[in-house]
UniProtKB/Swiss-Prot annotation:
Keywords: Ribonucleoprotein, Ribosomal protein
GO cellular component terms given for this protein: ribonucleoprotein complex; ribosome
Similarity comment: Belongs to the bacterial ribosomal protein bS21 family.
Organism of derivation: Bacillus subtilis (strain 168)
Coiled coil spans: none
Gene Ontology molecular function: structural constituent of ribosome
Gene Ontology biological process terms, A to Z: translation
Gene3D superfamilies, alphabetized: Ribosomal protein S8
Protein name: Small ribosomal subunit protein bS21
Length: 57
């Protein structure tokens, strides 16, 4: 869980920008999107092999 404390004399937009940056660095949002729906292990393996095949080319 990312936590951002609004500093003294800091605008809300700046604090929101810092929060978004920290969330993207930790990969929290990507992880949540990945786990939003259950994915069978066979589908995970298939996606993993397809990604490896794409990287190879």
């Amino acid at each position: 869980m990312s936590k951002t404390v609004v500093r003294k004399n800091e605008s809300l937009e700046d604090a929101l920008r810092r929060f978004k940056r920290s969330v993207s660095k930790t990969g929290t949002l990507q992880e949540a999107r990945k786990r939003e729906f259950y994915e069978k292990p066979s589908v995970k393996r298939k996606k993993k092999s397809e990604a490896a095949r794409k990287r190879k080319f």
